[in-house]
């Protein structure tokens, strides 16, 4: 019986037919909706992620420039859509303008405050120095939108070094240097009696022998001799010249880790080191009640081959990565650009730097 055969159907049959037609129309929509809901919701995409980000370096750190030919960030570091330039004529089109603080602090460079600043352009303050060496920063209130620093809480973190996972684990016999002839050594050029590291050294050398190299003792080491010399020491004094948050320099990454000596560290708190270095890969001065206790521990450890070798276990899984090229640090900005707040401004840069 068809729905439109009105001769043989009454009002009740007509209602049934209309209900059936409605059901048949709605059913496909329900099935389509159920199928569509299997897929995750699409998030909004930042349009800037589809275009090149231009990073303008206003002046090269320490006056030492590097080549920016072709697509530097992609060719050297496989960072895409990142254009690194140093021509000031490109200021109007730059997404980020980077200023290295040392040249500003010394008065060798100035901020281009006289130029009309394009809408949306971000200015980045960059420094690898400890706060005490950054000079006065109060005049930079409400100017910078971004910080580039070794600090882990910076907008773009550029450490002196870090540990990266190895593709394949190594063998312990290959990881522990065997040519040890000195208990402890220290390479220092800038020696100041009032520095904490100088006071610790004076106390430590009364307990254990410490060989000292560097301009301070008029026994400087060439770059070629540095690591081979350190490799002959059981321990290396990786003492920072400033006790500041996250300030961990090449003294740990290059001198100690790459040199093949167990680092005895003095710098930021123990927690800062634990955040970036494997456990049982370093010895922190603050872990001991006195420098005398530290010295006695070093003597005992050097005599215990098994316990000493445990401090090199990290080399099974990790390898040291040093950051020495400013281009690599600058290209890293593009990896963070789209995730940073667009309207961020440092109202008190000095407070952040000293924080």
Predicted regions, residues:
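A short, histidine- and acid-enriched strand-loop-helix "catalytic/donor-clamping" loop
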Residues: 129-132
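Pol beta-like nucleotidyltransferase catalytic core
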Residues: 2-125, 135-253, 257-355
């Amino acid at each position: 019986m068809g729905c439109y055969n009105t001769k043989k159907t009454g009002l009740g049959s007509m209602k049934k037919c209309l209900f059936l037609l409605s059901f048949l129309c709605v059913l496909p929509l329900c099935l389509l909706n159920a199928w569509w809901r299997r897929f995750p919701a699409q998030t909004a995409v930042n349009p800037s992620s589809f275009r090149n980000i231009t990073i303008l370096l206003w002046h090269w750190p320490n006056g030492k420039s590097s080549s920016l030919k072709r697509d530097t960030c992609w060719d050297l570091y496989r960072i895409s859509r990142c254009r690194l330039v140093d021509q000031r004529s490109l200021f109007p089109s730059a997404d980020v303008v980077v200023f290295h603080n040392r040249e500003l602090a010394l008065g060798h460079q100035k901020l281009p405050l006289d130029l009309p600043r394009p809408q949306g352009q971000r200015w980045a303050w960059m420094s690898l120095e400890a706060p005490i060496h950054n000079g006065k920063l109060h005049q930079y209130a409400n100017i910078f939108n971004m910080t580039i620093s070794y600090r882990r809480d910076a907008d773009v973190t550029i450490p002196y070094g870090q540990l990266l996972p190895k593709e394949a684990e190594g063998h312990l016999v290959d990881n522990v240097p065997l040519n040890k002839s000195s208990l402890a050594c220290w390479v220092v050029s800038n020696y100041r009696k009032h520095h904490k590291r100088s006071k610790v050294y004076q106390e430590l050398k009364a307990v254990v022998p410490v060989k000292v190299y560097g301009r301070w003792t008029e026994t400087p080491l060439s770059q070629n001799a540095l690591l081979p010399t350190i490799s002959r020491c059981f321990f290396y004094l990786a003492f920072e010249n400033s006790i500041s948050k996250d300030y961990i320099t090449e003294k740990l990454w290059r001198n100690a880790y790459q040199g093949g000596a167990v680092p005895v560290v003095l710098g930021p708190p123990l927690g800062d080191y634990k955040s970036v270095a494997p456990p049982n890969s370093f010895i922190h001065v603050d872990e001991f009640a006195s420098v005398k206790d530290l010295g006695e521990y070093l003597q005992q450890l050097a005599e215990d081959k098994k316990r000493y070798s445990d401090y090199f276990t990290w080399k099974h899984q990790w390898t040291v990565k040093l950051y020495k090229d400013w281009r690599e640090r600058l290209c890293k900005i593009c990896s963070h650009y789209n995730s940073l707040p667009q309207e961020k401004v440092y109202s008190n840069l000095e407070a952040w730097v000293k924080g």
